[in-house]
UniProtKB/Swiss-Prot annotation:
A single GO BP: lactose biosynthetic process
Any one GO molecular function term: lactose synthase activity
Glycan-bearing residues: 64, 93
SMART domains xref list: LYZ1 (SM00263)
Alphabetical list of Pfam families matching this protein: Lys (PF00062)
Record's GO cellular component terms: extracellular region; protein-containing complex
Domain C-type lysozyme intervals: 20-142
Family: Belongs to the glycosyl hydrolase 22 family.
Domain of life: Eukaryota
InterPro entries: Glyco_hydro_22, Glyco_hydro_22_CS, Lactalbumin, Lysozyme-like_dom_sf
Highest classification ranks of the organism: Eukaryota, Metazoa, Chordata, Craniata, Vertebrata
Localization: Secreted
Protein name (record): Alpha-lactalbumin
Subunit structure: Lactose synthase (LS) is a heterodimer of a catalytic component, beta1,4-galactosyltransferase (beta4Gal-T1) and a regulatory component, alpha-lactalbumin (LA).
Length: 142
């Protein structure tokens, strides 16, 4: 019984270290390379990430014919490739599961490509929720 409980705890702790629910200030810090990229302020990016994934780096959303991955909910039909959609255009030239870790480097590179190709309104939350009153998305701890 003791080994079962130990194994269960290890499984829970392992899972908890795999998923990363970031805080606003952590996102603000990790996205600093996006500051003013394409005319989009850092608070806009932080707000967009919150309303897109809730700052969950392992967020996966299944839609009718596609799946979206990670902090920025990057779509597998156009931007990345996975087993579900092997004929993706894969513009970011990356496996979608790379967007599910806490290293946001590849997420940021792909987000820049998305911004360059289709603009910030790729993320529907931006226009509706992240284009005004952005003071709440600043992080004073930095």
């Amino acid at each position: 019984m003791m080994s079962f409980v130990s194994l269960l705890l290890v499984g829970i702790l392992f899972h908890a270290t795999q998923a990363e629910q970031l805080t606003k200030c952590e996102v603000f810090q990790k996205l600093k390379d996006l500051k003013d990229y394409g005319g989009v302020s850092l608070p806009e990016w932080v707000c967009t990430a919150f309303h897109t994934s809730g700052y969950d780096t392992q967020a996966i959303v299944q839609n009718n014919d596609s799946t979206e991955y990670g902090l920025f909910q990057i779509n597998n039909k156009i931007w990345c490739k996975d087993d579900q959609n092997p004929h993706s255009r894969n513009i970011c030239n990356i496996s979608c599961d790379k967007f599910l870790d806490d290293d946001l480097t590849d997420d940021i590179v792909c987000a820049k490509k998305i911004l360059d190709k289709v603009g910030i309104n790729y993320w529907l939350a931006h226009k509706a929720l992240c284009s005004e009153k952005l003071d709440q998305w600043l992080c004073e701890k930095l």
